[in-house]
Each structure stands twice: as structure tokens, then as C-alpha cells.
Curated annotation (Swiss-Prot):
Keywords, comma-separated and alphabetical: Cytoplasm, Magnesium, Metal-binding, Pantothenate biosynthesis, Transferase
Protein name: 3-methyl-2-oxobutanoate hydroxymethyltransferase
Subcellular location: Cytoplasm
Originating organism: Yersinia pseudotuberculosis serotype O:3 (strain YPIII)
Subunit structure: Homodecamer; pentamer of dimers.
Function: Catalyzes the reversible reaction in which hydroxymethyl group from 5,10-methylenetetrahydrofolate is transferred onto alpha-ketoisovalerate to form ketopantoate.
């Protein structure tokens, strides 16, 4: 099996070929996802909520993410593997480089940072030192206390224009990939068309180059509130996890998921 690379993702964008991604936190699920055809995985700081039982991602540490990154890498050696930089782990460019290096040594191919134009110096520093970066705009969970909860971002014209400018700035600083979370579909389309780098959506409609879901949401095992953008693929697959993942991939690649009911206007 060939290793998935950023060059492939850029080619997929040019070919308008959509791709599906998932979060993963251990070797067993990572292997299962890879065997069904998932080629990009994220060790998300969402592990703080899905695995550790916290009510936000803020308590997650770099050591936590590194531990799970090593496990996922062992289970899916050929996937393009992203690792989240936890809250305050990139407060300065120097701190970001130290922690990014730790995650790269753990097996990540790329690190993901949440934030807008203020991150450009950090992204530039990392890119110059051979650390690939994925940006993250829209609803950035590490900023939950500023947002006052998990709310759709970019609905007002001023906010939408700022997000678009932030996306352009992140790409110019050296980001190779962008995650866009919980934004109106019209804004997601503007960002996806404006950028030359691939854009992965979550709660951003079916107009982005790729889609990502937290694995627990895709399998319908999330306790409590279920996000509007999520779909329980396991329930549509007679309880067969492998079939559920294949269905997720098929619906993303076919532009079926996310449907209108999963989309914000």
C-alpha cells in the first residue's frame, strides 16, 4: 500500500475529487479505518471529550496527543496523519516548534493549529523548519470560552470576510491544509474556491474538498448532544462498523454527505 501524501490531496483538489477523513485515537480503529479506504486521519484534541470525559478540549496535553499519535501511526502506517496542537501549546512560535517536533517524532505527518492571522508568524516558522501545518478556522473548539459555546461562525458579512482573509493569510504563511468548522455553506464555498490548498469541512456543507468527522459521531456512540452536521453511519449499516465506514466514504466521495439537513445557512 502506498503512503498518502499532501501532493495527492492537492491533486485531488484539482481533479475535484472529494475525500473522507476521520479522527482516530488507537491502533485498532486506525487499522480498521485504513483497511476500509480512509487515507487521512486526525489525532484530535477531541480525545479530551470522547476518551477522557472532559466537557471541552482545553485539558488535553501535548503528551496526550503524542501518546495517541504513536498508537494511530502503528495501526495505520500508510495514512497521512495529522495531530492536533492542544490549547496553549503554540502560544509562541518557539513553543509551537518544540511541541510540533514532539508530535512529528510521535508519527504525525502534519500538525493542526486553531486560529486566524495572528498565527501567521508561527506557521511561517514551522513551515521553514520542515513542519507541515494544517490551519483550522470557523468554530475553533479551543476558543469555546470566547465564543460563549459551540456556535456557527461567519454568519455576519464582516465575520465572513474576516474568515476569508484569515484563510488566505494562513495559506500565504505556509499552511498546506485547512479545516473549516461550522460555517455557512456559502462561506465554505468561497474559501474553498479562493484557496489553492485543500479545505476539509466539518459542518461546512458538501462544497469543501474533503470532510472530517469525529469517529464517535460517525458511529453514533457520542453521549449527550449530537451535532447537527453529524450522521450515524453505523445505524445505516445494520451495526456493521466496516460497512459504516465504507458508506461514509462513498457518501462523501459522491457528494451525498453532508446533505442539506447537516448544513448551516
Amino acid at each position: 500500500m502506498k503512503t498518502t501524501t499532501m501532493s495527492q490531496l492537492r491533486q485531488w483538489k484539482q481533479e475535484k475529487r472529494k475525500f473522507a477523513t476521520l479522527t482516530a485515537y488507537d491502533a485498532s480503529f486506525a487499522q480498521l479505518f485504513a483497511e476500509q479506504g480512509i487515507q487521512v486521519l486526525l489525532v484530535g484534541d477531541s480525545l479530551g471529550m470522547t476518551l477522557q470525559g472532559f466537557d471541552s478540549t482545553l485539558p488535553v496535553t501535548v503528551a496526550d496527543v503524542a501518546y495517541h499519535t504513536r498508537a494511530v501511526r502503528r495501526g495505520a502506517p500508510h495514512c497521512l496523519l495529522l495531530a492536533d496542537m492542544p490549547f496553549m501549546s503554540y502560544a509562541t512560535p518557539e513553543l509551537a516548534f518544540t511541541h510540533a517536533a514532539e508530535l512529528m517524532r510521535a508519527g504525525a505527518n502534519m500538525v493542526k493549529l486553531e486560529g486566524g492571522s495572528w498565527l501567521c508568524d508561527t506557521i511561517r516558522m514551522l513551515a521553514e523548519r520542515a513542519v507541515p501545518v494544517c490551519g483550522h478556522l470557523g468554530l475553533t473548539p479551543q476558543s469555546v470560552n470566547i465564543f460563549g459555546g459551540y456556535k456557527v461562525q461567519g454568519r455576519e458579512e464582516v465575520a465572513a470576510n474576516q474568515l476569508l482573509q484569515d484563510a488566505i493569510a494562513l495559506e500565504q504563511a505556509g499552511a498546506q491544509l485547512l479545516v473549516l468548522e461550522c460555517v455557512p455553506v456559502e462561506l465554505a464555498q468561497r474559501v474553498t474556491e479562493e484557496l489553492t490548498i485543500p479545505v476539509i469541512g466539518i459542518g461546512a456543507g458538501n462544497v469543501t474538498d474533503g470532510q472530517i468527522l469525529v469517529m464517535h459521531d460517525a458511529l453514533g456512540i457520542t453521549g449527550g448532544h449530537t451535532p447537527k452536521f453529524s450522521k450515524n453511519f453505523l445505524a445505516h449499516s445494520a451495526g456493521d462498523i466496516r460497512a459504516a465506514i465504507k458508506l461514509y466514504i462513498e457518501e462523501v466521495e459522491g457528494g451525498i454527505y453532508p446533505a442539506e439537513e447537516h448544513t448551516f445557512q
